[in-house]
Amino acid sequence: MPSLHVFYGGTFDPVHVGHLAIARAAHAALQAPIALIPSADPPHRPTPGSSSMDRLRMLQLAVSKEPGLSADPRELQRAARQNRSSYTVDTLTEVRSELGPKTSIIWLLGADAFVNLSNWKDWQMLPELTHLVIANRPGITLQTQLPPKMATVFNHRWVQDPATLRKTPHGHLWLLNQHPNPSSASKVRAAISAAAHWEADLTPEVAQYIRTHGLYGIHDIN
């Protein structure tokens, strides 16, 4: 079976059970390991609420007992070396250079991120570097919510069978139909600051890390 390299990018601020559910579903559907890549401060989103090293450590803790999942620090390391903004297209260009032109590469992202892809740097280049696997999210219908300029680039690229992704190195889109989890990082952060229940949305190891390191203002509510 041809090899398949799958990368799941995000701020993971913090990583929660919804992220892990998507990664597990992709691992099962694609029969390939999933490398989760925490982004440096993303230019198109607010600055993360915890440091890059905290986000990486929480991600490492979250995947430590998850077969087939790993944390990949390459984007944080590159941002630290170059001291500049973080862009997915740069990460994928680096990955493509490492793996060569014939290797099948997948970038995994949620539907909520995908519908805003036109805000990303050089987003039109992504199909030349990778396949895109989009995890469905509640309330988002991709067929009707894509801006016209995105529809022009992507609508002819959808495939029904994920096996197709192994046959070519890049250029296709596939919808990962998984049971959407309502967890979100913003809700977790808000719950912590409001002294509401938040632990159920995280693994025990990540919850303990937040307590130990006083992240997201938790010391203010103890």
From Swiss-Prot:
Keyword Nucleotide-binding: yes
Pathway: Cofactor biosynthesis; NAD(+) biosynthesis; deamido-NAD(+) from nicotinate D-ribonucleotide: step 1/1
Enzyme class: transferase
Family named by the database record: Belongs to the NadD family.
Protein name, UniProt field: Probable nicotinate-nucleotide adenylyltransferase
Source organism (scientific name): Xylella fastidiosa (strain Temecula1 / ATCC 700964)
Species lineage: Bacteria, Pseudomonadati, Pseudomonadota, Gammaproteobacteria, Lysobacterales
HAMAP family, A to Z: NaMN_adenylyltr (MF_00244)
Reaction(s) this enzyme catalyzes, per UniProt: nicotinate beta-D-ribonucleotide + ATP + H(+) = deamido-NAD(+) + diphosphate
Gene: nadD
Gene Ontology molecular functions: ATP binding; nicotinate-nucleotide adenylyltransferase activity
Biological processes, Gene Ontology terms: NAD biosynthetic process
